[in-house]
């Protein structure tokens, strides 16, 4: 479980493509100080398992299903990724509960910058529409955000300068692909309401 508060930006340094999975190595400096092999790390909002690590880098693997559901296939050497360690139950929660189970990817439709915020508009599938509500929570590339606008086929989030500076949102451009995870509470409520 995660909170959607990005702790570090990592850099992809190698990608090894195998028949049934891809192996990624991520440079992360001091981020790895208290981790061990087998720990869970959210990478762009995807719950991954550390399969190997050294002082300043770690490796994780993604199977075909993960590659299909996320933006991992779009990563390349030098790409920046958002990182977060799994929460401990005695820690303060500043964002919202993020499971690291990406529901789908969305395409950046529009980016509008001003001094106080950056508004990013993202495509929305018919299947995700029931879980996306004005002022509700959503995870985009592992970042806990509040939905600022919803339309039939897209939604928008507003990014403050601090978030823009400390996440890979600063690298986003139109038509880029991002990982989307619906708020788990919204999903469970929808299940309760629609189940007879």
Task: Give each language-model segment a name.
Residues 1-196:
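Conserved loop->alpha-helix
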């Amino acid at each position: 479980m995660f909170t959607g508060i990005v702790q570090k930006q990592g850099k992809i340094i190698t990608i090894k493509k195998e028949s049934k999975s891809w192996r990624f190595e991520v440079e992360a400096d001091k981020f790895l100080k208290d981790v061990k092999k087998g720990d869970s790390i959210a990478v762009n909002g995807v719950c991954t398992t550390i399969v190997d690590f050294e002082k300043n880098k770690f490796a994780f693997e993604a199977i075909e299903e993960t590659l299909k559901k996320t933006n991992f296939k779009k990563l390349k050497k030098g790409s920046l990724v958002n990182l977060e360690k799994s929460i401990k139950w005695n820690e303060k929660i500043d964002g919202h509960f993020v499971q690291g189970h990406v529901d789908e990817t969305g395409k950046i439709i529009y980016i509008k910058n001003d001094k106080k915020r950056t508004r990013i508009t993202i495509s929305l599938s018919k299947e995700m529409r029931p879980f996306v509500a004005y002022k509700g929570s959503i995870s985009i590339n592992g970042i806990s955000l509040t939905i600022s606008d919803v339309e039939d086929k897209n939604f928008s989030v507003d990014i403050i300068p601090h978030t823009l500076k400390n996440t890979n949102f600063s690298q986003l451009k139109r038509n880029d692909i991002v990982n989307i995870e619906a708020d788990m509470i919204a999903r469970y409520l929808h299940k309760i309401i629609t189940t007879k």
